[in-house]
């Protein structure tokens, strides 16, 4: 499955997730949605989010090293409202590359971090938010 096909499958499942009639059907669709996220195929240029506990950093995939190892860089951002959590995500990349490895559970975790409490990568959306309470 290619990267484009895997993201199309996720969008299809997300569309079906909006129309459910029973709780069992919703649960089955949520499981299918989670599976589609785990099966996403990374590609250079895909927008993603690095999740640091309560903070989110917008990033872009810069290299696919292997099928289970990728490099990402932060996107530049413009702060519109720090305490309101509003940021403009710019296309320019900044900072050094960070390596993420896909674990057996399907999650992308920063190289050298534990699966349980490690820094995660979300391939299915791009968001930037710095928690002002820390």
Question: Model-predicted segments: where are they?
Answer:
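Mixed-charge, low-complexity intrinsically disordered regions
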Residues: 1-58, 69, 74-134
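Residue-level recognition of beta-strand termini and adjacent short loop/turns
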Residues: 65-66
């Amino acid at each position: 499955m290619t990267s484009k096909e895997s993201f199309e499958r996720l969008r299809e499942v997300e569309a079906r997730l909006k129309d459910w009639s029973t709780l069992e059907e919703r649960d089955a669709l949520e499981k299918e949605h989670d599976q589609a996220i785990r099966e996403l195929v990374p590609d250079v240029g895909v927008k993603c989010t690095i999740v640091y506990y309560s903070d989110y950093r917008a990033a872009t995939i810069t290299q696919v090293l292997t099928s289970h190892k990728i490099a990402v860089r932060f996107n530049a951002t413009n702060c519109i409202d720090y305490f309101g959590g509003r940021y403009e995500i710019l296309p320019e990349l900044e900072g050094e590359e960070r390596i993420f490895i896909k674990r057996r559970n399907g999650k992308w975790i920063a190289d050298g971090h534990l699966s349980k409490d490690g820094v995660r990568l979300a391939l299915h959306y791009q968001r930037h938010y710095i928690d002002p309470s820390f």
